[in-house]
Amino acid sequence: VRLRSVPLGVVTFLGLLVVIVALTASARSFAAPSAVPAWLQAHVGNADGQISQVVLERARSLYLQKVAQGAVRNPCYFAMDATRPGDLGNGVLGRRYYVVCEASQSFRAISSGHGGGRNLKGTVNFSNGRRCAKNFGNAMDSELTAGGAYMTREAKTSFKGFYRTGAKQDVAFQRTFIQFDGEGEAANARQRVIGGHAAQVLRTMCMRKTPNSAYADHDGMVPFGKLVDYAGGRSNGCTSWSPADARQLISMVKDNPTTLYIYPESRDIAAIASGHSASGTYWNASCLKEIGTPKFWPRKTLEPVIAQYKQDHPAPPAQPLPICKEP
């Protein structure tokens, strides 16, 4: 068989055409949400450790959209179902925060805190219990969880003080915070300082003389406290994780942003509250029985109330921390 030679320019053009077609097909595959793969569908359900269908569908759609836009290259994405219980009793935490990595066919369900809200005594009560969240919202200083679409952003690590271990060693406590940027009703996430971090805090703070410490102030004093783990408790509106989970999640998104979808949004809450659940809307049955009717507090109505309460009940002047009694 006699082969005719093909000009080099034609070969180059054909090669580029193949690449362009391949890239276009790839982009389309991301842009159009594909069916949930069978291995992932096996994790769908309403039991502890499973992810409810509507939560997965919305989280996956958000992720694929951001990948198609070129905003996300991370192979994993996050979701949270804040209608589920955070505490199952007997020291067992509810798993309602999800880490999905489709490329490696990995699915994890872990615990996470929900926003505790506040009780402005004599004015309005939008606080939440430890187990289930009844109140949601996006108002400044409300300490409520707001559902919707988020992107993880920069990591900020800050020194909080020292604490003493069981081995009588003083350890510097530095906590890393992952800032979230939200969309729609969650668009003020940065303004509200909403993000993710370990569920740890220093309590019973005092000042100790440690002049040789790199963290000492101009008087040679450092803050000292008791390290408290509140993984089974409530947050100030952020997603809070156990220390071990926090280390893993922060390493996954540091300098490599991804998406987080938090359920429910205000439309879901309205549907449940009205008793006319729209298609795709759901609520964890155990928590719904406990809380009765959920409520969303929009910022336009709640922020003026909080501002007035602040004005009527000014915070006392900040006092310096006491000197530690123990050496």
Question: For each predicted feature, which ranges?
Answer:
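Bacterial N-terminal signal peptides
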Residues: 10-24
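N-terminal secretory signal peptides that target proteins for export/translocation
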Residues: 1-7
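Bacterial Sec-dependent signal peptides at the C-terminal "C-region" and cleavage site
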Residues: 21-33
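Cell wall/extracellular polymer interaction/catalysis modules
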Residues: 30-236, 244-327
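A conserved hydrophobic position in a structured secondary element of the catalytic/binding core
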Residues: 241
